[in-house]
Curated annotation (Swiss-Prot):
Pfam families xref list: DIPSY (PF11763)
Ranges annotated as biased composition (Low complexity): 149-174, 265-332
Entry's Gene Ontology BP terms: conjugation with cellular fusion; flocculation
Other comment: According to PubMed:16857197 the number of the intragenic tandem repeats for map4 is 9 rather than the 5 annotated in the reference sequence, producing a protein of 1092 amino acids.
Superkingdom of origin organism: Eukaryota
Stretch forming the signal peptide: 1-23
Family indicated by similarity: Belongs to the mam3/map4 family.
Protein name, as recorded: P cell-type agglutination protein map4
Amino acid sequence: MNSYAILLSLFFSFERLLTLANANSLYSPFNNSSFVDSDTSFSDLSRNGLLSLLDSNTTSASVQTIAISQTDNAASCIPSASLLSSSVVLYSAKETVTVSSYWSLVSTSVTGTVYVPYTSSVACFPYATSDAPNPIPRGDSATSTSIAPTYSASDSSATTITSSSPSTSIIGTGSTDTSVSSTLTYHTPIASPTTSSNSDNEYTVDVITSSSLSSFVITNVDSTTTSVINYIGASTLESSSLTNTVSPTESTFYETKSSTSSVPTQTIDSSSFTSSTPVSLTSSSTSSSGSSQDSTTIDSTPSTIATSTLQPTTSSPITTSAPSLSSALPTTYPSSLSTEVEVEYFTKTITDTSSIVTYSTGVETLYETETITSSEISSIIYNFSTPISGSSFPDGFKPINPTSFPSLTSSTKKIPSTTLPTSSKMITTTTPSVSNNTQSSFLIISTFTSSYEHSEPFKVSSVPLTSNNFSSISHSSASSLPITPSSYLSNTTLHSSVQSSQSSQFTVSVPSSTQSYSTSSNFTTPITISTSLSSFPTTIVSSSFQYSSLSSNVTTTNAQSSSLSSSNSSALTHISSSIVSSGSSSALSSSTIVSSINSSSSVFISSVSSSLQYSSSYVTETTTSGSVGFTTTIATPVGSTAGTVVVDIPTPSWVTETVTSGSVGFTTTIATPVGSTAGTVLVDIPTPSWVTETVTSGSVEFTTTIATPVGTTAGTVVVDIPTPSWVTETVTSGSVGFTTTIATPIGTTAGTVLVDIPTPSWVTETVTSGSVGFTTTIATPVGTTAGTVLIDVPTPTASSSPFPSCNTQCTNENSFRIQVINDDIYPSYVHLDSNNYAIAAARGDSDGENVFIYDSDIKRIVSCCGVKPIYRLDQDDTEGYSFEIYKDNDGQLQFKYPLNDALYPMELLTLTDGRIGITTNLTLYKPYYLNNVENERAANVVLRALEY
């Protein structure tokens, strides 16, 4: 054996020192205690200057863990209430896993099958609150490229849904108010027209609705003019007084709360809106000579809200077909579009309500005179059947003008004080006496209300009253509120609604003498509705209502009981409508001349309401067998019942997917139209037999429970097991038997899979001399006692090999023994003791391993069983843990360690107990080992490898 091999052996022993120091009670040069006690850390060793290295020979079991993870994509998501999910675990994937264990020379391999739970992704939307509204509508998956939106809170009463797609966003509002929580409205303004020739006259309108407050935003296209109208709930309005008068550009709305439902067989053509105006009177007493003044405020806010509701009617549905597209159209257009739209003009009502206030001694009584004039316009049918291409209307795209003009009816009645309608009330209050020099005042409220409804993406434009030339009248300024951005939803047909109103309030001061004041104004209020048919160019449908000769006359007299009266006249002189396509300079229009409507009263209250509504029907999407149906709830006109978008599921059979024998059936629950029972999508499982998978002897059966149509009992999928015997696997002598419990059809007792173990003898495995016998307990059929597997270990025979039984790498060509040169004992050879320390002794072939090899990769000596010897270190070997061993050509082993990028030789010695020590300076050993335990035996020893 040469010195190089000896050096390697010492190196391995050195590494083992760190771990085994506790067991060997190594002594520190500073005290007589253990060199490394159980609480000494590596840093403690460094401080003491005592280092050792360890390369453990302990064989540890290798454990292979197979993790099957299932992504829970609904953990932070609240799915739609109508979207049901099955709690049944489906198994759709499997993999074969082989687990092996090593023990001495006996290897056992067991192969099993792992069934991975099937995970289906359920699309859902998280909500900011737990009581979220109805499901959010989504676009057609075949044409929409938007991704699932996420939520971010914008304020306390609204929730904004945003998407990473720049062209898609949704603004919707919900409420935690249980009375209106089922209402959710989406607004989808279209993109700006391609031409801006008429943009100066356009205004965009957004409505953001909640249970208690909404904002109606009117914005000029060029962003030069902005008006915001508050939406005030009834409870808020009732507490208001004259001191909080509404500004001329603001409107007062009354909120109508209604539940949401759906009637699949009926088209909803209705609007439910409320129009009412508070009557407020103010009387004040002043003195021109500087005496004190008195003021009285009378608030006649209605206690009950008047409601006008149009009943649902049946109209033609919106259908979809598939004509071919023109090659000139952009690729972003839908593949087809053919839409027939029925536009119905509902009753236009002009109501003039007059009130006469009579001052008597201490009592004021309010009477109202109601004049009602109504007009009706018949339906207009527009047929959009051909895509728009270019700057003109193609054939089939021309609208049809109204078939008749409105017919007018008028009636006037005096409302007695005892039979006032629920929308108003008689006011009786005590007022001070009015002297001759009293200056009285009253309030004129003018309200204009419009309501629009249709089922296409739209933009509503409205211009407030443009002229109010009243003499001696003060106007309050408009409020400035934040502007709410527009919203857009691509490729989705919505049923949307906008309700607008402008209100002007004027206070006229009348001197004590008898005088008359007349006020008048001419104004035109155009209402423009811009629609976009899917991805086609912008189409503008506009209607305007023109009024003229709006006047008021106020007269007072000098009397103890003064009478205050006013007269006014208003005329709805013109109603016009037009349809203009973007890029076209021409417009198709119709106009109607309306006769003047006049009335006289002391307090003038004027309101005009109009309704433009596209007939609503279900939007359907036809699916084929194997597809999944779904239903999306969409917003409908304000005040009406919410409708739904229904996917047409083939009738009367289930939507099915045919599977072959051996496949697994599954059922998915889908949402159905609101109000009906949820249906399911059923995988067609062959009937009448079970879905089976034929197995051969030795296979494992399994059963999977699947969902069945709603209302029936869940079924199972059964693997066909050969009958009547057990499913068995034939093994030969030496194999291991096992039993696996499997699921059986629901209601039966679980069965087992039995490995056929030969009887009556043990299952044995023949091993060679040197192996270790062991017994393993295995499972037996259910109800029997567990048995064992016995390994037959032959009686060991004597071996003439120089290598130990654990040898894994030594051969006659690469192994050597290590001789210790200059030791006080001669001859001296290296062997490993029970703690793997390198020991120099005369009998190098006993008490442990004594044959080594040199590992050139790690530059270390290792034993035939892979153990690195441990060497005793001195205090100053701070780099000793990284030393290397080099074997010279003559076999001498050179110990070196790196320091400052250089290799320094290490010197050796032997201790009294024969352990080999390593140091960089032998003189340092003297003070440390001169004790009764670890005295040095010889210094400057050399290790040399002796080849066989």
